[in-house]
Structures are given as structure tokens and as C-alpha cells.
């Protein structure tokens, strides 16, 4: 079954591309393809021109459950970049590496649970044999006060 069909089965849609706020200059590419590998820059829980989740620290402004949902939305944004840049979602042979960053209060220890929101969607869409190695890290701040940011590396078929 095509990845787009699996998304539709779950009632999920790829959000519009992130619109960079006026006055903000970001000097990078969202995806770089080098041979049969694609490197995907850090993405957050955006929905086009707006934030698709609350902003702030997990454990203060966001509950763990809200952060898990933000991580799932981040996965949808990463998929959107892949779809726009590579022309589809079915050409991924394997998710090689995922780095998840959680903007959290001091002492927060559930980073892995939060980033499961990203990984669980990838698992549902691509299966266990294409699931990435992963790191989940707690950080004191993220750009724009995002609750989560994720970057990834995928092998292309």
C-alpha cells in the first residue's frame, strides 16, 4: 500500500510547507540529496504560516501528550518536505537516522516518549524493517521556542 494511502487511512494529511516569518533569514536547504541518501534539516510542528502546536517547554507550557502530538506533526512536516523535494513518499528504502530534540524543563526525562510521536508514525507508514536508529535529546531552548525539532537521514530506493 502506498504511503499516501496509509496516511489517508489514519485521517492524516501533509501540512502546507512552512512559511518563514517576515524578517527571519534561514540559510539552509530543507533537504539535500546526495546520491541515494537524503539529509533532511531540522523541522518543527508547523502548519504552513502558523504553528500547529503550542510553543514552549515540555513540562511547563506543554504536557507530554501535547509534545507527542507535536512530534507527530513534525513527522508530517518532514514527510511533506520529502514529498515536495523528491516527488513522492514511496521512494524511501530506509530511514537511517533520526535525531529528536525536546525543548524541556530542567529534570525532564521523557524525551524518548515525546519523540515516539515521530517514530510511531514512521513505523506505521514504513514498517519496522525501515525504521531508523534514533537519538532523543533534551535541550534548554529551540528556535522560535518550538517544543520539538527533528532532523533525519533516509536512504532512497
Residue ranges and their predicted role:
Residues 1-76, 80-98, 104-157:
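N-terminal presequence-like segments and the immediate start of the first folded domain
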Amino acid at each position: 500500500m502506498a504511503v499516501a494511502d496509509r496516511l489517508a487511512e489514519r485521517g492524516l494529511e501533509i501540512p502546507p510547507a512552512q512559511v518563514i516569518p517576515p524578517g527571519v533569514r534561514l540559510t539552509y536547504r530543507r533537504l539535500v540529496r546526495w546520491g541515494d541518501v537524503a539529509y533532511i534539516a531540522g523541522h518543527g510542528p508547523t502548519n504552513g504560516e502558523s504553528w500547529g502546536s503550542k510553543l514552549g517547554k515540555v513540562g511547563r507550557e506543554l504536557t507530554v501528550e501535547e509534545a507527542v502530538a507535536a512530534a507527530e506533526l513534525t513527522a508530517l512536516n518532514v514527510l511533506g518536505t520529502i514529498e515536495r523535494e523528491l516527488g513522492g513518499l514511496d521512494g524511501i528504502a530506509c530511514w537511517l537516522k533520526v535525531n529528536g530534540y525536546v525543548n524541556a524543563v530542567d529534570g525532564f526525562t521523557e524525551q524518548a516518549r515525546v519523540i515516539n510521536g515521530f517514530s510511531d508514525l514512521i513505523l506505521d507508514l514504513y514498517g519496522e524493517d525501515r525504521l531508523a536508529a534514533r537519538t532523543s535529546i533534551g535541550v534548554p531552548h529551540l528556535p522560535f521556542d518550538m517544543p520539538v525539532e527533528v532532523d533525519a537521514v533516509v536512504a532512497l530506493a
